[in-house]
Amino acid sequence: TKVEIPVSNVTPGTVAVLVHPDGTEEIVKNSVPTENGIQLTVNGNATVKIVDNAKGFIDTQDHWAKDDIDFVSARGLVSGMSATIYAPNNSTTRAQLWTILARQNDADLTGGSVWYEKAQNWAKDKGVSDGTDPDTAINRAQMVTMLWRAAGQSAAAGSAANFTDVPADSYYAQAVAWAVENGITAGVGGGRFDPDAACTRAQIAAFLYRSMK
């Protein structure tokens, strides 16, 4: 059931926390700030509390993606490099993106012979990625494509033809069209999407937040 809990002074770092009968707590990743509070989907008679879980990274305070970063880090989707550093302009590997998307979809990532093994298997099972090249940095085309696949590959009504650098027969054309249609990206300006550019940690936060609104 989708509900909205009234909250004053809500910020992107404001999250809903599910309190289980045994007292354990779990952040509700799909709890999204609205104009008047927090919207989330809950099952049955859940006990929920609202907390400010913003991390306060010192290197994002004046960054264009501060709100996006506050949102994803408060929900445990993207971790900081440390308690105080997010490193918004750093690139992201394929293994890191598998992990982020697996977390978003509540996959169990405990165990595995390497830290990304469970996320890698999840990505392959769900058709999000072929699971190769875990240490390779992702570009913008790969980011949007994996996000689209993780969201169920819904067809876009339009096309990505408004971008001069997205060929209609490219593997990522449908994903870019979907992302534009859903307000996830507007490109980089000048009629370009810049598919081959490295996708920074700030851009990943922005793509994720917009996809969850």
Model region roles, listed by residue range:
Residues 24-32, 41-67, 74, 79-141, ...:
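Feature responds to low-complexity, polar/acidic, surface-exposed segments characteristic
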Residues 199-203:
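Acidic helix/loop microenvironments that form the catalytic cleft of cell-wall polysaccharide enzymes
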